[in-house]
Regions:
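Active-site beta-to-alpha loop of glycosyltransferases that engages the nucleotide-sugar donor
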Residues: 96-109
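Cytosolic-side membrane-insertion boundary helix
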Residues: 232-270
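Conserved donor-nucleotide/metal-binding helix-loop-beta segment in metal-dependent transferases, i.e.
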Residues: 211-242, 246
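Short, acidic, metal-binding catalytic loop of nucleotide-sugar glycosyltransferases
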Residues: 110-125
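C-terminal catalytic/acceptor-binding lobe
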Residues: 2-57, 258-262, 266, 270-430
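Hydrophobic targeting segments
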Residues: 89-98, 114, 126-130
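Short beta-strand-to-loop acidic/aromatic patch adjacent to the donor-nucleotide binding site
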Residues: 196-208
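Active-site-proximal specificity loops/subdomain of glycosyltransferases
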Residues: 133-199
Length: 430
């Protein structure tokens, strides 16, 4: 009985269809394992690993570089230390408000990563403004440190009337971040307007920027203002940070909305191809019998097609360059505004007075028909998983650039140098 069963099994395994399934099964296991290793950072992948995805990798290196950079410029003596400041005619004004945090403080790493590795031409084109947004700025651990005066173009606390200052103190005491956050954002925008810079970059004090962020951003802005791809006066901001949590398969995607059709097409195409091969190459008929074709079309092709969907949309179709992001954009970690759009935006924020700043900007863009853009891949990471606004950690974890940590430092450095050396980029740095 056992011998008969074994012979039947061996006979079955000797069939072409069984051999195809065995080989395909082995290939599928290899592909599945590769996907587990390669796509575990995509939050909408079947291989997402939430246990390890928030560990710093590239951000940790940049934090060390940033802190080393600021520590060099924090020496007690001025001897041997050159101030690294911008000019009075910047191409970009970068501004951030910083407050004392109860736990982790990333302000120094934010400023350091913003400035370290900048070419002198890049630094001269950038005006950096820092607002200490505690009504008592001496509470902040970085207030008064020497590196600020040597690296930052404008360091300030509130320069407002007594009445406004008392109101800010009340907001601070009441933890009214919805109103004070909007006030600070408007304050920064107005500060940058005074510099005359054509672009205004507002970022938060708990981010880490990648090597080469400035030249890549200016290159993207050049595309938006020159040539056949110009979008003058039609966009409100260029986003340097976005999170992949918003970039999932949705009903807007044709092949996701029509997934049954996708499976039928690949299965039908595979079947047609195999039948065509069997018809024109008689030598294949013994192998390509009906059972083999059925195994390929009904098992193998659907399995590998399903694996593609399981990878996640962003893993399969990563963004590159300047792209529209009108729907899935999130948060205000790093937005670059064209100067001409800022006065009207300031007026709207002052009118609304309080709320979630990012939602208010999105609402304004919807009402005015202005396009929201993003520079891909992300140029900064939001490392402040503990919010300064009493937000839940589970909410701040969703504000994470998952693939940012896969950046290769050597590759980014080489790319930065290549972009600086390219003759067609001299326009933005001379």
């Amino acid at each position: 009985m056992r011998v008969s069963s074994l012979q039947s099994l061996l006979h079955l395994l000797s069939q072409p269809a069984a051999k195809v399934l065995l080989v395909a099964g082995f290939a599928y296991l290899l592909a599945f394992q590769y996907c587990r290793i390669r796509f575990w950072r995509d939050p909408h992948s079947a291989f997402f690993d939430i246990r390890n995805v928030f560990e710093w990798k590239y951000s940790l290196l940049r934090e060390h570089q940033a802190q080393h950079f600021t520590s060099i410029h924090n020496a007690p003596s001025d001897s041997g230390i050159d101030d690294q400041l911008g000019t009075d005619r910047p191409l970009m004004c970068a501004a951030l408000a910083t407050v004392k945090r109860d736990k982790d403080d990333y302000f120094e790493a934010t400023v350091g990563s913003l400035l370290t590795d900048l070419d002198p031409r890049e630094r001269h084109a950038l005006h950096l403004s820092v607002l200490f947004a505690n009504t008592d700025p001496s509470q902040h651990p970085s207030w008064g440190q020497k590196w600020l005066g040597r690296l930052v173009d404008s360091v300030s606390s509130y320069n407002v009337s007594e009445e406004q200052f008392r109101h800010l103190q009340e907001l601070e005491e009441q933890h009214n971040f919805y109103e004070k956050g909007v006030y600070d954002y408007v304050y920064l925008l107005n500060q940058c307007l005074e510099t005359g810079a054509p672009y205004i970059f507002i970022l938060e004090d708990d981010v880490i920027l990648a090597d080469g962020w400035f030249v890549k951003t200016m290159n993207g802005l050049h595309q938006l203002s020159h040539g056949s791809t110009a979008r003058n006066n039609t966009w409100i901001y260029l986003r340097l940070f976005y999170t992949e949590t918003s970039l999932m398969w949705s009903s807007d995607d044709f092949w996701y909305r029509n997934m049954p059709l996708a499976f039928l097409l690949v299965m039908g195409s595979g079947c047609a191809l195999l039948l065509l091969i069997r018809r024109h190459w008689p030598g294949t008929r013994a192998s390509l019998n009906n059972w083999t074709i059925a195994a390929v079309c009904l098992v193998v092709i659907p399995a590998f097609t399903g694996l593609l969907y399981m990878m996640g949309k962003y893993s399969l179709l990563p963004l590159e360059g300047v792209v529209e992001m009108n729907g899935p954009g999130c948060c205000t970690q790093g937005l670059v505004f064209p100067r001409e759009q800022v006065p009207a935006l300031v007026a709207r924020l002052e009118e609304k007075k309080a709320g979630q700043t990012d939602s208010m900007i999105e609402e304004y863009a919807d009402q005015t028909g202005l396009t929201r853009l993003a520079l891909a891949p992300q140029q900064l990471q939001h490392v402040g998983l503990r919010s300064s606004r009493d937000n839940l950690e589970i909410n701040t974890q969703s504000t994470w650039a998952f693939w940012f940590e896969e950046n290769d430092a050597r590759q980014l450095k080489a790319e930065h140098e290549r972009l600086l050396a390219a003759s067609d980029h001299y326009w933005l740095l001379d």
